[in-house]
């Protein structure tokens, strides 16, 4: 089960990273973000693309190295996902109301993935 959770979350990050590198404007379109300048496309490629690919890489490493390395990686990636979900919640608390998709859909995905990663090493 641990490997399956790591693989699913890793594939999510891999897909996000590839999508952000290949088509940054399409990736952020559901959020109402326009990428009219090269610098804005570069930023999305870095933050979503590079980060997604890096998370996929460390999760692949975790899948093949049980023990403290795996635990450290899964806890760190879970913290990153939890931070994303927390940022969405803080935005709502500050008065920014959003529809379910995309904001709350991704908040749910991030929360579930974070919880699943945290539970992988705690049986």
Where are these regions (language model features)?
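Cytosolic, membrane-interface loops and tails of multi-pass inner-membrane proteins
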Residues: 23-41, 91
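Transmembrane helix-loop-helix
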Residues: 62-104
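Physicochemical signature of membrane-embedded alpha-helices that form the seven-helix bundle of GPCRs
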Residues: 5-8, 47, 76, 105
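Juxtamembrane boundary at the C-terminal end of a transmembrane helix
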Residues: 117-123
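N-terminal signal-anchor transmembrane alpha helix
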Residues: 3-20
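Hydrophobic cores of alpha-helical transmembrane segments in multi-pass inner/ER membrane proteins
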Residues: 12-13, 53-57, 110-117
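Juxtamembrane helix-loop boundaries in multi-pass membrane proteins
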Residues: 35-49, 99-109
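Core segments of alpha-helical transmembrane spans in multipass integral membrane proteins
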Residues: 41-63, 79-80
